[in-house]
Design a protein with these regions (language model features):
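Conserved NAD(P)H cofactor-binding loop of Rossmann-fold oxidoreductase domains
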Residues: 88-93
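Conserved glycine-rich Rossmann-like NAD(P)H-binding loop of the short-chain dehydrogenase/reductase
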Residues: 30-46
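Conserved glycine-rich cofactor-binding loop
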Residues: 9, 16-17
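Active-site loop immediately N-terminal to the catalytic Tyr-X3-Lys motif
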Residues: 98, 146-152
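Residue(s) in the substrate-gating loop at a strand-loop-helix junction
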Residues: 141
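Substrate-binding pocket helix/loop in short-chain dehydrogenase/reductase
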Residues: 96-97, 101-106
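Active-site helix of classical SDR
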Residues: 120, 157
């Protein structure tokens, strides 16, 4: 059973489908206002309806200045604080390691590691103002522990 999150507000990155979409819905159903930041700004076709309390916003977590402005604007709606950040945005690319394009490697590391850290830093000042001191939840993957030959950089980025 989920805790009562009435009056709480926070951000889920990469929530237009999959795990992020479901996390956003569960948090909203528990009473939170959930801002989902994704490249499309809307749920992917066929994933269903978002719960009441979920607000989809178009944004690129790789654009730090834009995220600073967006996060400040969202926090301002909630007395200058946020209660949670769920870093869910992530990418992968399937290719054997010996043929892996470095451009794809860089993209995976940027999105799955660097941007996760940057988003945490951007949100931290607002999270620490929360009555509950806020929470940062980073979504990882079993791939980090199992390893798969066709997604080596993804596995490394999720550890």
């Amino acid at each position: 059973m989920m805790a009562d999150l009435k009056g709480k507000a926070g951000i889920v990155t990469g929530g237009s489908s999959g795990i992020g979409f479901q996390i956003a819905n569960v948090l909203a159903e528990a009473g939170a206002t959930v801002y989902v930041i994704s490249r499309t700004g809307r749920p992917k076709e066929g994933v269903g309806e978002s719960a009441s309390g979920v607000v989809h916003l178009k944004g690129d977590v790789g654009n730090v200045e834009a995220m600073k402005a967006m996060v400040a604007e969202l926090a301002a709606k909630h007395n200058g604080c946020l209660d949670f950040l769920v870093n869910n945005a992530g990418v992968s690319y399937k290719c054997r390691a010996e043929n892996f394009p470095m451009e794809q490697f860089d993209n995976i590391m940027n999105v799955n590691v660097k941007y996760l850290f940057e988003m945490s830093v951007v949100c931290y000042p607002y999270l620490k103002k929360s009555a509950d001191k806020g929470r940062i939840i980073n979504i990882t993957s079993m791939s980090a522990h199992l390893g798969f030959s066709e997604v080596v950089p993804y596995c490394a980025s999720k550890g």
